[in-house]
Amino acid sequence: MAQARLWTKDFVVGIGLNLSMSMVFYLLMTSMAGYAVARFSAGEAAAGFASSSFVVGAVVSRVLTGKYLDFIGRRKLLIITMAISIVASIAYMFADTLVWLLAIRIIHGIAFGAGNTAIMTAIQSVIPSSRRGEGTGYFGTATTLSTALGPYLGVVLPRAYDFPMLFAASAFMSLVAFILCFIIKLPKQELSDYQRRSKWHLKLSTLVDPAGLRIGSIMLIVGIAYAAALVFLAGYAEDNEVASAASLFFVAFAVASLIARLFVGRMQDALGDNFVIYPVFVFNLIGNVLLAVWPTMPGIILAGVFVGLGFGSLMPCMQAIAVKSVPMSRVAVATSSFFLLLDAGSGIGPIILGAIMPLTGGNGMFMLCAGLVVLGMIVYTFVHGRHRGGRPGSEFLG
């Protein structure tokens, strides 16, 4: 029987949209802590919040976006949120106090969270159900590329041209995403009777999905660990007199993750979740241990490879598990629930770790992150691995 077609025009445009949106996130996430220190003399915790306040906004918006996405319209919401992203990127240049910077970050995060939920949900209706893991993995390569290009430019642009050039780059990527919103065609999701009846019922069951929360809880834990590298690795590398290793970490992360995503999705579809998930947890663990015990140029680059194989592969695999667990009418809510907890980990991670780092040092902080990866693996075993993860999961989507 002929395999369902995956590489359509809209799937490719969706990858471009995802890349542009993710670039905005990673461009600013890795540089805002340093900007807050340089511009406003912020302390470690405040600098961490300058970075993660964006994620706070994203978490807030995801709570409601999953429920109301199909009422608003997926493409319409993408257009609105990307327009806001353009304005917010320009507004950073005019923020003259830390409070204003934080306010813009939160608003920008709200727009990103809503737009990201829209594209992550919509692309699942473009991917054939029989190729769910494979398609989600390929789609995630855009995020992978942005994890290398975004942090790299986030370090290079301020050093070469100062921070306004960084904000201009963010505005440009938002503009690219805005244009792509008019090119992509997304299938319209018909509202179920339950969705219509419960439109104004803001009960917990209508805002979040249990399957999305279960799998998202794992990403909450490991997301905190990845936030350490995202926000504090540049300073950690500089303290160890290998400042240039930080940008190379993200390049190594992206290359390793990109290679892994070319085949882990197909392996997940064919051989089951556990066959893929447990090895990527181990890779992630090794990467964090390397950061803790070998903070040299080769050690940090090698850590980037292992974290790329680990965390970089884990995210699309977990998303595929979440969306396979619900009917089509619940995909938006399940997707928003999944990313809500992933964002929460990225948001609270810099705040918690920023407070802990002065006590433990960078080495101790990354060893703590290794412990979080182990905890995430244990949680996975209890919420999914021991029940359904050992074989290809049954799918509601069709």
Question: Locations of the language-model features?
Answer:
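Juxtamembrane intracellular "pre-TM" segments in multi-pass secondary transporters
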Residues: 1-7, 186-217, 398
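Helix-breaking motifs and short loop linkers at transmembrane-helix boundaries and internal kinks
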Residues: 41, 73, 94-100, 272, ...
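Residue-level signature of mid-helix packing/kink "hotspots" within the transmembrane helices
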Residues: 55-63, 147-148, 254-258, 262, ...
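Conserved MFS/SLC helix-loop-helix module at the cytosolic interface between two early adjacent transmembrane helices
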Residues: 60-93
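Helix-to-loop junctions at the C-terminal end of transmembrane segments
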Residues: 61-73, 261-272, 357
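Paired small-residue
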Residues: 99-107, 287, 298-306
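Cytoplasmic helix-loop-helix junction between adjacent transmembrane helices
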Residues: 106-143
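C-terminal membrane-cytosol helix-exit motif in multi-pass small-molecule transporters
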Residues: 172-192, 379-384
